[in-house]
């Protein structure tokens, strides 16, 4: 349910946001052109997928000279940033707000804004976006070409592709819906 509260924020909203900050519940919140998007914590299936991705993507990322970061980080700047579920970085300094990433990883949650982030990622030069949907058991791998994302069969960054990844994910750890599949767009 979207909710827009115009400035100045009521004391109750300020109190809620401060409480979320204090308790560390705001880690997945995002700022979209100055508009705060308050996101709930992810479902348990999200963490199981995230751990598998860390184990599968880490070795080929390191072999390619990239830095695996399977956990939330900020892409953008203070008043306009997105928080992917993980990614791969090129070597460089650690930052609070990264200007880009080699790869952004998104794990879809019901009703989230994963697909709406693509224009932002493109504008920030994120080379590839890996989207895993645990409910649909689908892996999408997109590469940035001429300012837009296109489905790709193999990463240009690491020795992996969506078909290979979908076959390696242990979907059986998740609620039984469908057998793992790959989206071709």
Segments predicted by a language model, with ranges:
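Gly/Pro/Ser/Thr-rich low-complexity, intrinsically disordered segments predominantly at protein N-termini
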Residues: 1-185
């Amino acid at each position: 349910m979207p909710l827009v509260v115009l400035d100045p924020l009521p004391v109750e909203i300020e109190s809620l946001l401060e409480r979320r900050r204090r308790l560390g519940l705001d880690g997945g919140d995002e700022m979209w052109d100055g508009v705060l998007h308050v996101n709930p914590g992810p479902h348990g299936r999200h963490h199981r997928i995230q751990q598998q991705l860390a184990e599968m993507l880490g070795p080929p990322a390191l072999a390619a000279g990239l830095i695996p970061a399977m956990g939330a980080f900020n892409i953008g700047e203070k008043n306009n940033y997105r928080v992917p579920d993980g990614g791969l970085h090129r070597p460089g300094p650690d930052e609070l707000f990264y200007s880009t990433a080699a790869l952004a990883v998104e794990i879809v949650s019901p009703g989230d804004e994963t697909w709406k982030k693509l224009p932002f990622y493109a504008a920030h030069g994120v080379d590839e976006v890996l989207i895993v949907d645990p409910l649909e058991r689908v892996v999408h791998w997109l590469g940035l070409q001429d300012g837009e994302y296109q489905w790709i069969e193999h990463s240009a960054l690491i020795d992996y592709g969506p078909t290979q990844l979908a076959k390696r994910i242990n979907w059986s750890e998740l609620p039984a819906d469908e057998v793992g599949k790959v989206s071709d767009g």
